[in-house]
Amino acid sequence: EPGRDPTQTLKAKEGSAGHISLADIDCDGDLDLFIAGRSIPNHYPKPADSWIYINDEGVYTESNLWSQPFKGIGLTSSAVFAQINADSMPDLILACEWGTPMVFINTGTGFINRTDFYGLNNFKGLWCGVDVGDFDANGLVDFVITNRGLNSSYSASIEKPMVIYHGDLNDDGVWDFIETEYGADNRLYPRRSASDFAEAMPWITDRFSSYNQYSNMTLTELFGSSFIEKM
């Protein structure tokens, strides 16, 4: 209700919270809370945790048991509860950036990741939304999951997927990430310009003497295999 003070404030987490969904996951007659971890500040795209809060007579308490399957699950951009299998308990579907859509089945005491069972393990993408419905009117739950659109500077295919490396590249305590793209020779090249890299990683300018040289350097030639293996 507009103007009302919050009835409860949840303790802050390391990750940035994203999508929030409600369902009676423990079937006790009240709504429990799923909070999606969107990202970890200054550590993109390191996988983030998501959390389950159980409603106990109007007070939401984080449940380590229910939250366990969502530790380090990824950059969760959207979530929806739905009754997917034959029982009456709400299951959970997630859309994750730099990952796959994920399906978690409710057992009554926790969630089990059944993404592979539903054939979604190979559908990697920059997923940003998910919803459910009986779209073909056959009595079964269908999914609609949205990915990054074609009106983007990014493109990918099964043969040439998008690849990103991330980690503390030079042990300075700063989390780095490197976007790449496949060249005509099927080798990986840095996607960002030399100027972008120089701003984020000034030491990288020692690796090339001209923009022309940089434009022809593969990822391994620019960073070296030992650096890439760290990420």
Feature names for model-found ranges:
Residues 1-231:
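Beta-propeller-forming repeat regions
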